[in-house]
Structure formats: C-alpha cells, structure tokens
Amino acid sequence: MKERKFVNEAVKRLLVYEYLVKETENAGFGKMSMKRTPFGTNITLYVNRPGLVIGRRGSKVQQMTETLEKKYAIETPQIEVKDVKDPDLNPSVIAKKIALSLEKGWSYRKAGNTSLKRTIDAGARGVLIKISGKISGERARYQKFIYGNVKYSGEPGSKGMLVGFSTAKLKVGILGVTVKILNPEYKLPDVFSISNLAGGENVGTESETDKADEQGREAANTEES
C-alpha cells in the first residue's frame, strides 16, 4: 500500500512538473522545487523572465494555482516565482534558447557553438550540448558540442551534472536539444588538496579536473550518425 502511494505521489509530481514547464517555457524555465508544509504545498519556479509567469496583477500565477488545486489535487498550492541566478549556467534555459534559435532558422552548428561559447564565458567547468534529429539531410543523427570536464556515469554523472532538455519544431521534423553542465557547486571526487601539517596551511592542490580545464580551453566538437 505504501509502495502504491509512493508511486502515485511520484507520478503526480511528474505531471505537475510537466504542466508548469509547459506554462512557463516562454519565460525561460530554469527549475522547480516543490515542498509540502503544514500550511500547504510550496512551489518555487525559477525562470529567466519572472514577469511573464506572474502576469498582470498576478493573474497568471492565480490561474496556475487554481489548475494545480482542481486538476492535480495539490493541497493549498502556493507558487513563488524567482529569477534564475545564472541563466547562462542553467541547462534548461540554455536548451530552450537553442531550440528557439533553431526555430528561427539558425544552423545547428551556429546555435550550438554560440551557446557553448556563452556558457564557457559564464564560467562553466564542463558542458555538453547535443542536438539530435534531421539536422542535415534526410537521415536522423546528432551533433555534440563538448567543453571541459563532462561526466557520464557514476555519482558525478548522476549528481554532478545538471541536465536540461527542449525541442525545436521545424519543417523537417522535431529536433531534440539536450544540455548538460557540471554543477559549479559540485565537488568532484578526484579533487584533493595538500596541506602543511605543521601550520595547517594549504600549500597546493591537484585535480584531474583542473588539468582537463587547462588543456581543453577550446571546445571539441564531435559528430556522429
């Protein structure tokens, strides 16, 4: 019984997430946090353009609140809208920008490289941008734009990488855009420091991540079919 309740709650949370992403995608959806309290359910939306989500006199927020309560059975939902702190380091915002650029007629290379450079300039330690679909010709394939330290597996891959996804609707079909960024606050397990035991002074640091950043300042683009 507990397992079924847990599954139902997870499904409800996913449906709420999908609904809010759809409602706020034009405002540059960044992320969402949802927390139950004794007074109701607090939902915080991080977007690139908060004004579009709030609406005139809070009309948009009021409409979403009513939908969450009636359609999704969320108890006393309270929505708070906040600005994304670093939009150029938020994978969801970046993925949406790339999708919009593709829909405006940008080539996939221009859209990918431009976003990659902007993310690098913002201070990202590792970035992966993947555009998939019929990007050129009739055959579906994908193009990757990679920079710095990107983790694919283990705890660094699941907890250290922030992931965002969006789609671009073109005449040739739908293109998928996936963006992964190494969380600036995540400490990689291969990072360690050497301290002066006598005085407790930090005398040096060593990290494979730092080496990768120094050696890979230029983005490496890879293409596969």
Swiss-Prot record:
Residue ranges of domain KH type-2 in the record: 16-85
Comp. bias (Basic and acidic residues): 208-217
UniProt keywords, alphabetically: Ribonucleoprotein, Ribosomal protein, RNA-binding, rRNA-binding
GO molecular function, one term: structural constituent of ribosome
Gene Ontology biological process: translation
Keyword Lyase (UniProt): no
Stored Pfam families: KH_2, Ribosomal_S3_C
Family note: Belongs to the universal ribosomal protein uS3 family.
HAMAP family named in the record: Ribosomal_uS3_A
Protein known as: Small ribosomal subunit protein uS3
